[in-house]
């Protein structure tokens, strides 16, 4: 929910933030969900699928192969399911995810979400887990960056 609010309010063209998202699956079960999000990206539906995967986690998390559940979600958000199914088996998705995760490891990422502002990881305090807390950090960093640029 916090990520959705941040994307809606800050990740806008010409806005104060450049929103960059990297794949960083933490558990075996999250790897196929990450692939599903990348396949949705091919149809311009990355964030819709991402948000749906989290909203419907109970429908897929305990399945050995959750691809059927992801196809159902793809259908629910208006995707071409034939194209989506074909994408789920592409090897380049695995390579892309592993490279993205390694990039995160190289930056010191140990969990999700991890948020960087002006190249620095935002500490995971109680403030980090609320929209208002993150908004306050963003505004403080934006003000500091503006002052430094004067």
Where does each model-flagged region fall?
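Structural alpha/beta surface segment adjacent to cysteine/selenocysteine redox centers
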Residues: 1-75, 80, 139-140, 144-149
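C-terminal cap of thioredoxin/glutaredoxin-like
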Residues: 1-10, 71-150
